[in-house]
């Protein structure tokens, strides 16, 4: 028994010595004294960080999780770069996808109206052509007053005061706003002129007479403006003054329009409604009492009001678009004498056509 107990004590003592020696080996104790890097104590998992996104992204099913820039061990710096590049690629991919999924803008309202009107005109022309042939189409257009109104208004407005007012305003403000304001004024003026002409046309019915007073008044007005346009063109000097200098007889239409715009629109406008109103008011009051207005009155008294109104508005539209797109450029090449002669000749031609019942 004593031998057994002694052997057990010896074994336990040897085990204790062995453990103590193992715990205190020289190289292990030396390793404990060496500085240990802090990166070895970092957790080996990558913490996740969520960013709150707008509701719009959540509706489209976009949810993004980005890992932090923390790395493990000696590769922490390169790992941060990889995470940064990954996050940048994640940042760029929703932008490109949102651009590809961006819906197209609505179809322009003014362009849709123009297409509808053009389609209606083509359908009407096709029906008339099928029923009566090409001659019926030309007769319908001629009798409606559209051709006469379009020709007279277009020639009268080229180089007119309202033409240059629209051109000068378009150089300062948005062209679309200037076009809308100018066409609003010209359309209203055209409708008023046609209504006045219709009133003159109804005068003979009130006096119970068969004498076409309205047509005679229209012929007189057309002849008056034709002769006046030719006389004004004759009185102009052969070489017009440039850069706003006076000719000794009168200021040109461009100079008058420039003075009017400087006086009435000297303050720079930023509100779209103010630009619309300024374009409307300047063109409306410049057009009031002009030869194109009185020519519309004369045509409205002698021909179909609807055809005259549509032709006059179409002529105003074409002339105003030309003024806005390149009126200042055309001002250097437009001859006021030539415009006066051509306009006067057209007035006389349509006066004779109205007298003989061609239109």
Swiss-Prot record:
Protein's name according to its UniProt entry: Protein PAM71-homolog, chloroplastic
Biological process annotations from GO: calcium ion transmembrane transport; calcium-mediated signaling; manganese ion transmembrane transport
Family: Belongs to the GDT1 family.
Transit peptide residues according to the UniProt entry: 1-66
Positions with biased composition (Low complexity): 85-98
Region feature Disordered, mapped onto this chain: 71-102
A single GO cellular-component term on record: chloroplast inner membrane
Annotated PROSITE patterns: UPF0016 (PS01214)
Superkingdom assignment: Eukaryota
Keyword check for Cell division: no
């Amino acid at each position: 028994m004593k031998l057994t107990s002694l052997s057990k004590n010896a074994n336990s003592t040897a085990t204790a010595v062995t453990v103590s020696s193992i715990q205190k080996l020289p190289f292990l104790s030396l390793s404990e004294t060496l500085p240990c890097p802090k990166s070895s104590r970092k957790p080996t998992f990558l913490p996740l960080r969520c960013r709150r996104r707008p509701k719009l992204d959540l509706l489209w099913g976009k949810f993004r999780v980005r890992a932090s820039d923390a790395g493990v061990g000696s590769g922490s710096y390169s790992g941060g770069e990889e995470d940064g590049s990954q996050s940048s690629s994640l940042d760029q991919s929703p932008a490109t996808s949102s651009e590809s999924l961006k819906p197209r803008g609505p179809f322009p309202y003014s362009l849709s109206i123009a297409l509808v009107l053009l389609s209606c005109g083509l359908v009407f022309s096709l029906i008339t052509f099928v029923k009566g042939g090409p001659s019926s189409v030309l007769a319908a257009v001629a009798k409606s007053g559209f051709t006469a109104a379009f020709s007279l208004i277009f020639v009268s407005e080229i180089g007119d005061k309202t033409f240059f007012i629209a051109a000068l305003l378009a150089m300062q403000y948005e062209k679309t706003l200037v076009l809308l304001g100018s066409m609003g004024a010209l359309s209203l003026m055209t409708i008023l002129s046609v209504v006045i002409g219709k009133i003159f046309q109804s005068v003979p019915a009130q006096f119970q007479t068969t004498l076409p007073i309205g047509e005679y008044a229209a012929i007189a007005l057309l002849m008056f403006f034709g002769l006046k346009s030719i006389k004004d063109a004759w009185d102009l000097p052969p070489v017009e003054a440039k850069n706003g200098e006076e000719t000794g007889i009168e200021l040109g239409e461009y100079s008058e329009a420039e003075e009017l715009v400087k006086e009435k629109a000297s303050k720079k406008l930023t509100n779209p409604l103010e630009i619309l109103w300024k374009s409307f008011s300047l063109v409306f009051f410049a057009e009031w009492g002009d030869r194109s207005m009185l020519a519309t009155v004369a045509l409205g008294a002698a021909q179909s009001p609807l055809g005259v109104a549509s032709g006059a508005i179409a002529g105003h539209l074409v002339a105003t678009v030309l003024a806005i797109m390149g009126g200042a450029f055309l001002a250097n090449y437009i001859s006021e004498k030539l415009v006066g002669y051509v306009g006067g000749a057209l007035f006389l031609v349509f006066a004779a056509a109205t007298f003989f019942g061609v239109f």
